[in-house]
Amino acid sequence: PNQKAKLELMATEAFLLFAQDLSGGILNPNMIDVNINVVPYRKDTNMLLASLTENLDVNSFFDEHIPSSNEYNALVTELRKLREISRNEYWGDLVPADVPLEVGMTHDNVPLLRKRLSKMGYPVYQTHPRLFDEELDAAVKKFQEFHGLNPDGVFGKRSIEAINVPPKTRLVQVLVNLERMRWNN
């Protein structure tokens, strides 16, 4: 009986730590950098236990304690995609940074750009593989906007740097941003 009680206490403690990590993050921001002035909100364990006993549905309990913003949910969706991509494939060959690409140009780098954008989920159909056409321009603008770049359609140095980031690096960036959002939950 004593062993069973000890196991139950350990399971409860692990459950509460997990709930706190979900709601307030895993890492202490000051351990990463002393200049980070964020104090994550840690939910009181008594409040968490009371919340669980009121609502015996564990899924609802966790839903109640994780960040619920659209941005957080979008990052979780992106994380799932990136995990799948990182396991099974990559985004194609890198786009060389030798020349900026824009509408109306014909260049050997355009097929690489089309392929990489397509693998990243931006629909781009090939009418003339080497031609940077209006359709490719629309996909480039969406890519630029999604990555916080000026959506001007010119695929220059910053856009090329952004598209050439490997999926595993993007995955780490998403994980870091999810953690930051939990700190502010």
Task: Name the predicted role of every residue range.
Residues P1-N185:
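Auxiliary tRNA-acceptor-end handling modules of aminoacyl-tRNA synthetases
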